[in-house]
Amino acid sequence: MIIRPAQLLDIEKLSPLYAELGYPVKEAELVRRLKTVLSHPDYHLLVAVDDNEIIGMIGYAKMLFFENEGAYYRILILAVLQNYRRKGVATALLDAVKNCALSENIHALALNSGDTLERQIAHRFYENYGFKQASRGYSLYLK
């Protein structure tokens, strides 16, 4: 397995990962969306590839702190195909982001995760990785 930056040709292969997260999306819409997101220099997407198949992805953005100096990486999406879970793929993706952060002198990672029964396994994974529950998230959709 290798972890590498996503390429434009990869985008159309990511829809199964979105579907497994509960966000089914048409390939054309996903291509359009990710081209926009990834055109921003602070947004990044890494993919895990095994035997020429994309089996996982992690998307993150460099954010600036308001409350103190410096920056952090906010993980915006992390997904692994069902057949590859519990095989170290998500850990490898997080390790890659952590290494990128440390190379840029960034010393914090943050993420939000849905408060649903389906996400309980992910929450345990994050805690086992070293994340601490630090806040509560809220959403207000305006459309």
Stretch-by-stretch model annotation:
Residues 63-65, 80-83, 114-118, 143:
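Short coil/turn motifs at secondary-structure junctions
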Residues 80, 86-99, 124, 128:
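Conserved acetyl-CoA-binding loop-helix of GNAT-fold acetyltransferases
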Residues 91, 107, 115-135:
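Conserved active-site alpha-helix within GNAT-family acetyltransferase domains
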Residues 8-70, 76:
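Acetyl-CoA-dependent GNAT
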Residues 1-9, 143:
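Conserved N-terminal entry element of GNAT/NAT acetyltransferase domains
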Residues 87, 104-107:
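Short coil/turn segments at alpha/beta junctions that flank glycine-rich nucleotide-binding fingerprints
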Residues 43, 133-138:
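Short hydrophobic/aromatic beta-strand or adjacent loop that forms the aromatic wall/cage
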Residues 75, 109-113:
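Conserved hydrophobic beta-strand within the GNAT/NAT acetyltransferase core sheet
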